[in-house]
Amino acid sequence: MVRDRLAALARRPELIPGLLAIATFVILAASQGGWEVIEWAPAGLVMLGLLAAAAFAYRARLRELDRANLIAIVLLAAFVAWSFASIAWAEVQGTALDGANRSLVYLLVYAVFSVVAWRAGSAAIVLGLYSVGLAVAGVFVLADAAGSQDAALSLVNGRMAEPTGYPNAVAALFIGGFWPAVHLASRREVPWFLRGLLLAAAGFLVQLALLPQSRASLIVIPFALVFYLLVTPNRIRASIALALALGATALAAPTILDVYTVATDGGNVGEAFSSAADAMLIACAGLLVAGTLIGLLDSRLELSRSTERTAGRVGIALSAVAVVAGIVVGLAAVGNPGDWLNDRWQDFKGDYDKGGFGSSRFTGDLGSGRYDFWSVGLSDEFASAPVVGEGADNFAVGYLEHRDTDEEPFYPHSLPVRLLAGTGIVGTALFLGFLVAAAVAVFRTRLRYPDPLGRGVAAVALAGAVYFLLHSSGDWLWTFAGITMPVIAWLGIAGGGMRGREPVRPTPLPLPAPARIGMIAAAALVAIVAAVSLALPWISARLTDSAASGWPDDPQAAYSRLDTARDLNPLSARPDLVAGTIAIRNDDPTRAAAAFTRAAEREPTNWYARIELGTLDLADGKRGRGVAELHRARELNPAEPLIATAIRRSRGSNPLTTAAIDRDLLDRVCSRVGATQQTRYCKN
């Protein structure tokens, strides 16, 4: 049996990097969505290794890459290089390094899946296994919540937050797995006994996506669905699979949405999760049976090409009718569209949850801090450096200085704002160029590929990208590698020139022998630099996390790890910030002051290091220097109430203590998100 499996892999060698990559994607998805450097950096090293192996194995194919696909790789590489260049002028260089490295990981993913020569069947296997793997991860997440003695730890303000820790990212993660599953469930090329499993997985994933009650996903997914129906082959089959998956979800939705109601009303969350799980199980069982029966029937039903073309036209017509009907119903529900849009705009500009949500978050107003995030990101940060930007992912510094809310986002909750504010017009143009070139490459596959299964893979890639780009326009999904990497990968598969029974001949880009040798040498050098760039911050972050969690048992060992972490990543102030915090809790003000001083030297705009230094100086009798540090902190973060309190109390005989500062910051986190899997300390 093992020999047979190895022989099967030898016949489809592209499955080897594909299976390793999707295993990485699923692991990232289950590891808080892969938004921290300790998660995405090792994934990037895996991708780098896969790219090196793929480039060697498919070296003859490198000269035959489709021109649009090659342009996409070059433009994305240029965007990554620009992001690294932005470190030079970024105020927080460690954050800019992380932002550039994250973009590097996405480049590696796109390159891996572009270089490999995919056959439609192999591509379908990879996409299908990803969806099934994600559904299996979802089963564990749901079972953990339903069986937990404290199920509320899986929620943030009544919304499902696992496995990413952020509700909106949970919705985007599972919807990302929905597209391949629902499409493959409609394909005749897929064995009939697997189509039911895929349809059940599709239904389960979209049901999981309801638990976070993400308003952005509810707004965006209709556009992605319409786009999917426009670009997918065999629209009748696709429409049937969609109708079944979404219909079963609609039947289970009231029980699923009740989790939020019970949680916000203070009810038994565990029972609510159990009821939701039962409803989802019944719905998915129905989908399993229906999908299997349809697959069996479809495998024995032969339709002429003219009938399929007619059915496709009917599918387009029905989609158009559904869109028009939806618009009519929507207009009837909202009344005057101008007044409705104005009301929603005023909601959006207002405070978060100013009017409450009632029994469902979908029915509440649109208030949030995003209007202020985007306003500062564009009118202050982008306007101050429109060409080059403030530096990759350097949004937080400028926002704290100019904000009108009490929120402290690290990212602007918008991919366009992130690009403009962080990388300026240059970086934004490079990234948009990549998207256009990648889309052209995928559309070529969609239009020219001889096999409907391959054209369907292109449709899945396009639909997933449309959903991701629309949703990430209003959220920080780019930061979650477990969400972004699959989207990039599917674009690479579909745009890289898949092979069929009659392979599409790509437009070659001839390269003379000296150029090839030079490119190989340059690629080897770049690979070494990339490995170092990813490995050192990753090891530094792991050592820092280890010190932060293990210092009560051995403080000296923790300090030693932090010293090493500081040396490995000379751009990051985090090791010193953690060292200072540990020293405060160990009642070692001298060590704390030294650590926070080093942190302030690495990040002069770090207000937390400044307030801690000011407080330590006041406690040590150095009033003049302490007050100066507090005023510098206020310049960096004028709206921070802790700084105002520290300055006011510095005038008397009872200055604010470092312990009080840390306690207040922890209380603030607990008041905003409550006790979750990541903030269990909030229960105490």
Q: Predicted regions span which residues?
A:
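Transmembrane signal-anchor hairpin modules in multi-pass inner-membrane enzymes, especially those
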Residues: 1-85, 91-98, 102, 108-133, ...
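TM-adjacent membrane-interface loops and short helices in multi-pass inner/ER membrane proteins
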Residues: 166, 354-410, 416, 423-430
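Membrane helix-loop boundary segments at the extracytoplasmic
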Residues: 26-36, 418-423, 457-487
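Hydrophobic transmembrane alpha-helices and their immediate junctions
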Residues: 425-459
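Membrane-interfacial helix-loop-helix modules of multi-pass inner-membrane proteins that assemble, modify
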Residues: 84-90, 102, 135-178, 182, ...
